[in-house]
């Protein structure tokens, strides 16, 4: 089918958002680039497992700091940043050699994660123990700034223009707005009780914040940083993800064992979908047709059709499935099973488990390069 292309005019902010979205998509959806490698943070054995997607085998096991929880891949795919909760370190690995090039001390804490700024020059790491964000120069591994934020920060999201970052603090009930040019807090926004997860809409207009203690989602206008609405959802909302087109946001409610579908045009919950026990993480297929939800308490995945707003399949996996990532080509989902010390591999065409790959103890964070 021939498609007619029409010229459109877009402003510099839109261009920045498109480029930022593209770089983020390539970092997290690398299937179109050819080789795919899965990285798993093994919290209980202080290692990172490297899995080759084609062979479905562990090709390397890398010793890192104590209690690794998350792995983040730089936009140029040259580095992996491993946040280690117990040793409070960030370990930086050169890829694909898997050599340790730097260890940044006192940089993170439990639940801490690293994200990369626009262009990939700097990484920003949350430190829940010290209530601050550590700024690291990616190429050198040098710590360049420490930004004090609210009490108990774990998540962080970068604005589409690369100029700001947003950090919810669970005990302060606020979201800190960071000026990344100056590495200071520009303002703080009230965001319900125990704000936990944050996500920015595809068009860059809205910031959503889950209030794990107030059972709602705070909608913040990005341009003004004003609270537009608080949307009631289920109990203990802990995870947020936008669909590819940005028309819907999906919220995992860990306390009520369901998923809320929010229509962004009306900013209302359009459907509430029951899932398994204690939903933990979710990822969408590249087409956006299905969302896969890990259920820690029932040891399975709920597969939800975004078109019908219903569970179409429940897939058994290992014990206490925590994080999930879908490969960029949409062929496989990889699930970190913290209780059985392995990775479940799901064929997304058949929606059937095809492999269980043994890794280290208590695998948690998982990502694809």
Label each PLM-derived region with a short phrase:
Residues 11-21:
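Bacterial N-terminal signal peptides
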Residues 22-369:
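Predominantly soluble domains enriched in secretory-pathway, periplasmic, or organellar proteins
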Residues 2-12:
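Bacterial N-terminal signal peptides that target proteins for export
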């Amino acid at each position: 089918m021939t498609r007619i292309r029409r010229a459109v005019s877009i402003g510099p902010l839109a261009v920045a958002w498109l480029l930022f979205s593209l770089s983020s998509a390539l970092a997290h959806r690398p299937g179109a680039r050819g080789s795919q490698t899965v990285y798993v943070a093994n919290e209980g054995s202080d290692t990172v497992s490297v899995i080759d997607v084609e062979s479905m085998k562990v090709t390397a096991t890398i010793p890192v700091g104590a209690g690794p929880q998350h792995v983040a891949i730089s936009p140029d795919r040259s580095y992996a940043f491993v946040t280690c909760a117990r040793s409070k370190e960030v370990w930086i690995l050169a890829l694909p050699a898997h050599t340790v090039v730097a260890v940044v001390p006192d940089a993170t804490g439990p639940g801490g994660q690293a994200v990369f700024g626009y262009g990939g020059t700097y990484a920003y790491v949350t430190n829940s123990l010290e209530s601050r964000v550590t700024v690291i120069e990616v190429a050198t591994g040098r710590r360049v700034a420490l930004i004090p934020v609210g009490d108990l920060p774990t998540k962080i999201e970068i604005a589409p223009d690369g100029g700001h970052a947003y950090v919810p603090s669970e005990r302060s009930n606020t979201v800190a707005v960071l000026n990344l040019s100056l590495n200071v807090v520009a303002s703080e926004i009230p965001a319900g009780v125990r704000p936990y997860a944050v996500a920015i809409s595809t068009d860059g207009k809205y910031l959503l914040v889950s209030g794990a203690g107030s059972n709602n989602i705070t909608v913040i206008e990005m341009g003004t940083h004003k609270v537009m609405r608080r949307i009631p959802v289920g109990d203990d909302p802990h995870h947020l993800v936008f669909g590819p087109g940005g028309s819907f946001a999906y919220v995992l409610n860990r306390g009520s064992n369901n998923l809320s579908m929010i229509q962004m045009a009306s900013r209302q919950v359009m459907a509430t979908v029951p899932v398994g026990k204690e939903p933990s993480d979710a990822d969408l297929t590249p087409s956006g047709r299905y969302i896969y939800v890990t259920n820690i308490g029932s040891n399975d995945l709920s597969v939800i059709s975004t078109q019908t707003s219903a569970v179409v399949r429940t897939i058994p996996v290992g014990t206490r499935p925590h994080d999930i990532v879908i490969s960029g080509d949409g062929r496989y989902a990889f699930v970190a099973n913290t209780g059985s010390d392995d990775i479940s591999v799901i064929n997304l065409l058949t929606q059937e488990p095809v492999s269980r790959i043994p890794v280290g103890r208590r695998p948690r964070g998982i990502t694809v390069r």
